[in-house]
Amino acid sequence: MNIDNNLLIEQKEQQLILTLNRPEASNSLTPELVEVMIDALTQANSIRLCVIKANGKNFCAGFDLSTIESLSDGDLLHRFVRLETLLQIIHHAPCSVLILTQGHSVGAGADIVAAGGYRVAAPGSTFRMPGWQFGIALGTRRLTRLIGTDAARDLLIDTKVAEAEIALSMGLINEISAQSDWASLILRAQQRAMALPETSLNTLMDLTCLLYTSPSPRDRQKSRMPSSA
């Protein structure tokens, strides 16, 4: 296991596990953490399954805003560009990407969830995307393609908190699972990722990303979040 102060990196048996490790800051994303994640994802070879999870009570609180007042507009733009690079790498990964969340996933943290291929939340998890309050559009298209136009607008305009059950009904997550069951869930995901030859899996992931621009079934169903959420 390669241990960074902010990220634990474990690679074994064609499996890459990235664990956000800033629990004292709700795993908020510093520029350094974003770069370490980008490096880990781009340098890994022959991976069938990538797991992204976090230590502590919360999955990810989004951007680390502790130094925002000292940043120039150029510095802030660079941070957004690098975060979008990370999200694109996750979304277009040539392997299966499993996201395991607990507690709160906010802003860029929720964007990481939406970029993953299979998204699992522990009971009691919540998701919130307040970026448009600040004019930040990161992840908007991915979210819309994932859950549909109406549900995305409900989340983004009203900056609603989506609890796990609501997120599941919207399609933001695929499954609710207790953290005690995550080890078996990872094993199941690994077995599924090994079902195809590596080149076939890579091609499949690439083609389905290209087709991701097709209208979501949830768009056609005009699904909406309950107003009480």
Annotated model-derived regions:
Residues 40, 82-93:
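Catalytic-core regions built around general acid/base machinery
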Residues 155-156, 204-208:
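Short alpha-helical scaffolding segments that buttress acidic/His motifs in well-ordered protein cores
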Residues 46, 54-86:
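Glycine- (often His-adjacent) and acidic-residue-rich active-site loop
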Residues 18, 52, 64, 112-114, ...:
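Hydrophobic/aromatic residues within transmembrane alpha-helices
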Residues 212-219:
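Conserved small/polar residues in nucleotide/adenosyl-binding loops
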